[in-house]
Amino acid sequence: LWFDMITDQTHSQLISNNMDLMGLNKFLHTHYDSNMFDRFKFKFDGLETIEKNYSQAYQDMFTLSVLQGKRNGTYLEIGSADPYYGSNTALLEEFEWNGVSVEIDKELVERFKNARSNEVICSDATTLDYNEILSRISDENNVVDYLQLDCDPPEITYQVTKMIPFDKYKFRVITFEHDRWYSGDHIYNESRKLFTDLGYVRLVPNIAPDNRQDYEDWYVHPELVYPEVIEKMKITQGKIHKSEDYMIETKNKKGYGDFS
């Protein structure tokens, strides 16, 4: 199993047991390793230093690609879950990013505190003062590099999204989990309208770790990301997009771009 590579044996077994209890597919995560370097479509500064990533569907690699390997970035991660397995920010922390993670599960929060350097808040995400949190991590222009929105169920994710002061703060990259594959079109459609109205560009729609279970949209702010990056990385088709096919070159296919 992939998570055997990123954690100790005891923690790995605990993850495996919990996933069995929840009926989850332990092989559904797609990941990058250094053997894929030559086939990685959107190369960025520092890619050569990465042995492996952690996200379920390349969200960490996508963020670094959009921001061209940025060091010392910032993030707000709402719904952090495990500190490494499936984490969208563990790799960013290795790139010296600073951020705040929010997680309601006390056991996961304790694991996070023991394993990671950045701040984690144990709380119901619908009860927090996001203006206060963002004031601590945003730059002088009230910009944060990455926002992850991933609560369960997606109705909670959307509720939290409405609590974030987008009128004051902007984000270079946003990943929003709508879980359309099992929750239907309501949150899927409402979230798309919200982010479009806020001026964000949906760079990659209907992302999935496989070819069936579309569960996320990926956005960027056009004022905060280079236009040539948007042009090279944007997908306009509405079908489901397998994350590995989007990020990794396969034989006889031409890549979307190279930012090295």
What annotation goes with each model-predicted range?
Residues 2-72, 84:
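Class I SAM-dependent methyltransferase Rossmann-like catalytic core
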Residues 49-50, 80, 178-183:
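Short histidine/acidic/glycine/proline-rich micro-motifs that form metal-
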Residues 67, 116, 137, 164-165:
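Active-site catalytic pocket residues across diverse enzymes, especially alpha/beta-hydrolases
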Residues 64, 131, 135, 158-162:
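Amphipathic, non-transmembrane alpha-helical secondary structure
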Residues 42-52, 119, 143-152:
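Acidic/glycine-enriched edge-of-secondary-structure segments
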Residues 74, 89-98, 111, 139-149, ...:
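Conserved acidic-Pro-Pro-aromatic motif
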Residues 50-131:
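SAM cofactor-binding core of SAM-dependent methyltransferases
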